[in-house]
A protein has these predicted regions:
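Conserved glycine-rich cofactor-binding loop
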Residues: 10-11
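Conserved glycine-rich Rossmann-like NAD(P)H-binding loop of the short-chain dehydrogenase/reductase
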Residues: 24-40
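Substrate-binding pocket helix/loop in short-chain dehydrogenase/reductase
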Residues: 88-89, 96-98
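Active-site helix of classical SDR
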Residues: 112, 147
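Residue(s) in the substrate-gating loop at a strand-loop-helix junction
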Residues: 131
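Active-site-adjacent segment of SDR/Rossmann-fold oxidoreductases
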Residues: 136, 157-167
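C-terminal helical subdomain
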Residues: 167, 171, 192-229
Length: 229
C-alpha cells in the first residue's frame, strides 16, 4: 500500500489527489492548518490521518510536526498548498510578499527537509505543484511568480541532491485549473470566470499519478499541463 502526504487537500488539486488515492485504498496523510480543518479533512476522507501545522509561519513547521506522529516511510510527498494575491509591485505590501514566500516556497523546503528520511526509506517521490507563473511571470502576480520561480529552483536542487538516495522529484506546471484560487483571481482582475475554459482538478491529479506510477528506470522531471480544446 502506498503512503502519501498531501498539503492543500482541502480543495482543488489537493482534494482531487486525496480522492484519487483514497479510491485506490492508499494510506493518506493530510496536512491541515489547524485542528478544525484537520477534523474537516478526516470527515471527508475517513481513513486518512492528519497533521497540523501552519505553513505561513516559517521555522515553526518542524517544531510543530516533530511533536506529532509522523509516517516512517513515504511513497510521495505532494506540495499542493499555495496562496496568491494580485497587485502591482508598487502596491503589494511586505506582508503579502512574506506570506506568499512562506507558504509557497519556504514551507515546502522545510517540510521536505523534515520528511527526507521517510522518503529515502521508501525511495519515494516529491511532487511540487507549480504554475505557469513559475515559467513566465505575468503582470500583477509578481509575489506569486517569484515564489513559483523559487519553487522550480528548489525542485532542481533537490533532484540533484537526492538522486543517489533514489528519491525522485517532479514539478507540475498546471495551466488554468478550475479551483477556488482561480475564481478569486479572476474576480480580482475583473475578468469573467468560465469553468469550461479550465482544466478540472481531477485531470491534473490524474497526470500527477501518471508521473508517480512510472517505472523506476524513468523520471518525469517536469510536467506541463494546459487546458484542452
Amino acid at each position: 500500500m502506498g503512503v502519501h502526504l498531501i498539503t492543500g487537500a482541502g480543495s482543488g488539486i489537493g482534494a482531487a489527489l486525496a480522492a484519487l488515492f483514497a479510491s485506490r485504498g492508499q494510506e493518506l496523510w493530510l496536512l491541515a492548518r489547524d485542528e478544525a480543518r484537520a477534523g474537516e479533512l478526516r470527515a471527508r476522507f475517513p481513513r486518512s490521518r492528519t497533521l497540523v501545522a501552519d505553513l505561513s509561519v516559517p521555522g515553526a513547521i518542524r517544531a510543530r510536526l516533530e511533536a506529532q506522529a509522523l509516517p516512517g516511510r513515504l511513497d510521495s510527498l505532494l506540495h499542493v498548498a499555495g496562496v496568491a494575491e494580485s497587485g502591482r509591485v508598487g502596491e503589494l505590501s511586505a506582508e503579502v510578499w512574506q506570506d506568499t514566500l512562506a507558504v509557497n516556497l519556504i514551507a515546502p523546503a522545510e517540510l521536505t527537509g523534515l520528511l527526507l528520511p521517510a522518503l529515502r526509506e521508501s525511495r519515494g517521490h516529491v511532487v511540487f505543484v507549480n504554475s505557469g507563473a513559475g515559467v513566465h511571470a505575468p503582470p500583477r502576480l509578481s509575489a506569486y511568480a517569484a515564489s513559483k520561480f523559487g519553487l522550480k529552483a528548489l525542485a532542481e536542487s533537490l533532484r540533484a541532491e537526492e538522486f543517489a538516495h533514489g528519491v525522485r522529484v517532479t514539478t507540475v506546471y498546471p495551466g488554468e485549473t478550475d479551483t477556488p484560487m482561480q475564481v478569486r483571481l479572476h474576480g480580482q482582475f475583473g475578468l469573467p470566470y468560465v469553468p469550461e475554459a479550465h482544466m478540472s482538478p481531477t485531470s491534473v491529479a490524474a497526470a500527477v499519478v501518471t508521473a508517480l506510477d512510472l517505472p523506476r528506470d524513468a523520471t518525469m522531471s517536469d510536467l506541463m499541463l494546459r487546458p484542452g480544446c
